Amino acid sequence: MDFTHFDDVAFAYYGLPDQSSLVSLLDHTHTFQSPTAFPQHQAMSGLAHSGLPFGTLPTGNRSQSMEGSKAPPDRTSPASNAFENPTTDEFGLASCNRADGTDLGGKPREDKAGATPAWSGLKTKAGKERKRLPLACIACRRKKVRCSGEKPACKHCLHSHIPCVYKVTTRKAAPRTNYMVMLDKRPKCMEERIIKATPKSDQEVASFVTRPVVKPAIPGAVPSSKPTKKRGAEEAFGLDLEAWAKAPSKPKIEGDDRPSSLQAQEGEENKLQHEGTEALPSEEIQEHLAEVFFDNIYGQSYHLLHKPSYLRKLKNGTLPPVLVLTVCAVAARFTSNPLGGRSWALGGQAIRMAFALQLHKDLEYDPSGRNGAKTQLSFIDREIRRRIMWACFLLDRFNSSGTDRPMFIREDTIQIPLPVKEKYFQFDMPAPTELLDGQVPHPPSPNDGQIADARENMGVAAFLIRAIALWGRIITYLSQGCKDLDPNLLWEEEPHYIKHLNDAVNLEASLPLSLNYSAENLEVHKTENAASQFLFMHICLQHNILLVSRAAMSARKQQGVHDDFFSEASQRTFSAANRISEFLREAEQSRCFVSAPFAGYCAFSSATVHILGIISCNPSMKPTAEANLTTNVKYLHKMKKYWERATQLSFLQYGDWYNRYPRGLSDAEFMDPATHKRKDSGADGVLEAKPELRSVEEYSTLPTPRRVENKDTIRAAAPKRKQSAKKQTGMPAQPGQHLDSLQSTDADAVSQERKFSGGLGLQITGAAGFNPLSASNQQNPDFSTTMSPTSPANMTPFSHYAHTPTFFPPELLSIDFGQGSNGNIDPLDRQLIYGGYSMDASTGLCGGQDMMSGLGWDTVASGAQPDGCLQGRPPNVKAGMHGQSAASSSFPAINKTNGKGKEGRGIGSHTDYGLLVIAAADDVGGDMMQYMTNSVLPSTPHKVGLNLRERFAFAYFHEPSFQAVVRPLPGYDHGQEPKGGIHYGKQFTDMFMRNYPQRITTQRLNDEGRYRLLDQESLQTMSP
């Protein structure tokens, strides 16, 4: 065909010069050529015009236009004779070496025979011709491709446009190890590692594993006659595998000539190690609760277990079931699983068992060795023994925080070092630490390889133990009689008080730099999962300072007291309370929940100080106190999720919380036990619940059984009480009585006294209306002249409880609460036990009572000293309707509804008007508390009467001042009405007049126009 007839559509067709790079098209553009440009024949020599090897890409400007291409047409023209050209087909495409995969996109292979390697002229060290490349470049070695060996750049690096580097080293190549020899050595090395890392107890369990038997060679098999340098599996492992498979699973101890009684005893002990296996939960629950234990309980306050070894043994099933069940029971309280658990601890038994095991001594050998055999204790074993003993020590200190609870463990009996840092314990790194008194028992030598500074080796656990030990010494001094035996005064330089104060301050100052409180150290402890322990330690340190400084207020009324001494004590008290709130706020922001119950005790102690800061006249103290009190209330509210049962206790001291289960059983298990066949209790019978005995809780809540011989006396006394009540009802009110001295005298307001004589064995001879608080106290003249918060003079005149009596029964006052020589409970936790101090009407906070001890709010709000220490109100200021009151009453079984008169005095569901009411088995917030916290702490409806059984109540009422204007706390004012606050005097008067419209007090308020006086600004001068 003549191409001259198709000039308009003539074009040059180009084949693919490099089919391995289809995605990288070259600048072979289409050009319009004359037909004469196409030769009829194309020889092989036509491939050499480009000057590049076959398969490589020609260089040039890749952005060149199609019209500017100058590619030779004789290579790709379809007009060439393809039948005479063996390298092209009828379409002009290259067809050489199609079997090498280039037609499918593969890279063409280079002609090995046509090219001589650059290293072919080199000689080996032996003088022979080199057949292999001596050294490949770094790039080819990384990509694991064959290197051409050219220098300065090989073909691969030149083609890839990367630097070509040959790494020359003088190190001789190691001789190649026989493959079978290498396989033979690897299991032995791994076995040696496992044996070194596995404890002895785990090795004994591993010996019971069934071992497989190696199958023998197949009979009749002809061995390979081909010689080889590698050994066969039978030759390499035959002897070892045969000896290992034939070894007994449990080696028999030869020469065991122990007596049969000892063998039987060991058999019983081994049986006890597996007792309780059937009660274990699933493995998933065990592992989950173990993680919960180490996240929420470990280190707050007890450092008992070694987490890596515990989790390893838990997975292997080598832990005693009793230990697994104990960890699960303790951790169940903090799990998100709704099925909670119960746990209790017999502290006395734990302490005796610890001493029996000689845990209080730092021994190098196991003291329980049989037949005098001494087993060396490893560092982990010794550290676990120490931590168990320190846990018993802390438990004894917490359990002995009450007023009449002596401590059993003396500090000088513990001869073991304090725990090491947690990372040393986790990674099995021995390190010396100090004793409790600061001495180093075994100082290491420089060649031991241990850290010489013993103080730097101690972490949070060690200083937490020192803080709790100091707290125990402070309690012993303040609460258990040591303060009364101290002949020196508190402000002198020699008394024990100054020593305890210096110890509390110096303990915080002695912390290493890594344990000082800072944002950096907190982040470091976060990474170690010990931030909660770190914050808890600092809370305990500040609580010691708060406790000692607050106790100094009780000596204010004594002669010769320096004002500077009490000014410094007040500043330290408020500073420590603020620091505790800061730590709680930081824990909330860092999401590090401090779950120890003792932290809640510290938060409550701090909150009592913040309340005084809120009602202070010093304007600089109020904002800080309000913010800190909000933080403490939030934290205590969160603690209710885990320690909810603690709110139902009759005694509010921290140490008395352990009286919750005096039998070791909860109420649900004791009152409604499961029916089962009674078994012989054996030696544990002393710990059983005795049905004929009564617990402390039953004694406080259930009526006291009356003796038969006293029935006639009780029946005869009932009409006398009724006649006395009628006489009191008929007494007219005094006409000139002022508003703040108005008082209702309804006979129905006086309830029956609780009779403690049957249970306490007390002799009561006084009349029913006798008030023992009005009698003089010859032994304590100062106490008799002070205004007690339980006296009628301090009772609220507008008593909104019809059942509130005007006196304490003499039986209750006769109970010994461990009072000091001044007639009051010692300064330990006075805000937790009502009536714990005397209150001088002429002095306030700085006048001898504690931060919350018997103070009315308007008592401390009348003035403030420059240092922030609150003053009391002047002697001419009357008490008014404010302060604290308490009552102990008896309520008979009644089913009458509310109504007028004596027939309807059931007093059903209601709320209280004031700020806070603490009653037996109830913590009832008042209406003011609900308004201040925006219903976070609601005013709980509760019943006084309308019960089918007789009940006894001991109630404590904390009332705001009559002049107080209550406002919501910061952060709780969203949507609160009224926004301007509530005047408590008007609120209380409205409630009184609505509930008692027929009383003479209500009539006088209306007739004499006294109700309008509540609008005067002089009666709205206080803002709590």
Curated annotation (Swiss-Prot):
It comes from the Eukaryota. Induction: Exclusively expressed during infection of common bean. It is found in: Nucleus. Keywords: Metal-binding, Nucleus, Transcription, Transcription regulation, Virulence. PROSITE patterns: ZN2_CY6_FUNGAL_1 (PS00463), ZN2_CY6_FUNGAL_2 (PS50048). GO terms for cellular component: nucleus. Its main location: nucleus. Residues 137-164 bind DNA. The keyword Mitochondrion does not apply. One of its GO terms (molecular function) is DNA binding. CDD domains: fungal_TF_MHR (cd12148), GAL4 (cd00067). One of its GO terms (biological process) is DNA-templated transcription. Multiple copies of the gene are present in highly virulent fusarium oxysporum strains. Zn(2)-C6 fungal-type transcription factor that has a role in the establishment of the fungus within the plant and/or the progress of the disease. Regulates the expression of virulence factors such as SIX1 and SIX6. This is Zn(2)-C6 fungal-type transcription factor FTF1a. The gene is FTF1a.
